[in-house]
Amino acid sequence: MNTQEAIRNIEREKENFPLYESVRDKVVETLSYGQKRLIALMSAIVSGESCIIIDEATDGLDVNNRKILSNAIRKAAKGRIVLVVAHDLTFASQIADCLVFMKDGCLTEIQENSGEPEIEKMYEQLYSEEGGR
């Protein structure tokens, strides 16, 4: 992607990141951990890639930034694949179309998102036998 494409993509996506205007002229080292996480996500989204992988997206984010992140991921998912690794079942239930569970490094269950209560039941069934992950 050239510079002009990057600028167009940033302009198109910045409305999904309310903090953009407040941090755009700051040195990265002065930003909070949560702000850095959101800027990293914005960078991935504006890259134009058809697949984005996000690991533990909510780690270190306050409630407000979690909402911003959820909205941004849902909007970014249109027309692309977004793979989110998460242990936060509430967050997963808010953003996922499909959930994949792993145990001992292997995929054990794939299901459509049927809401947080059903996700919690599946999680308990998979992991309670051995006392956790």
Residue ranges and their predicted role:
Residues 106-128:
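Conserved beta-strand-loop-alpha-helix hinge in the C-terminal portion
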Residues 52-55:
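Catalytic Walker B motif of ABC-type/P-loop ATPase nucleotide-binding domains
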Residues 41:
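Hydrophobic anchor residue at the start of the ABC signature
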Residues 88-94:
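Conserved H-loop
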Residues 67-78:
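Helical segment within the ABC ATPase nucleotide-binding domain
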Residues 27-31:
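Conserved ABC ATPase signature
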Residues 62:
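ABC-family nucleotide-binding domains
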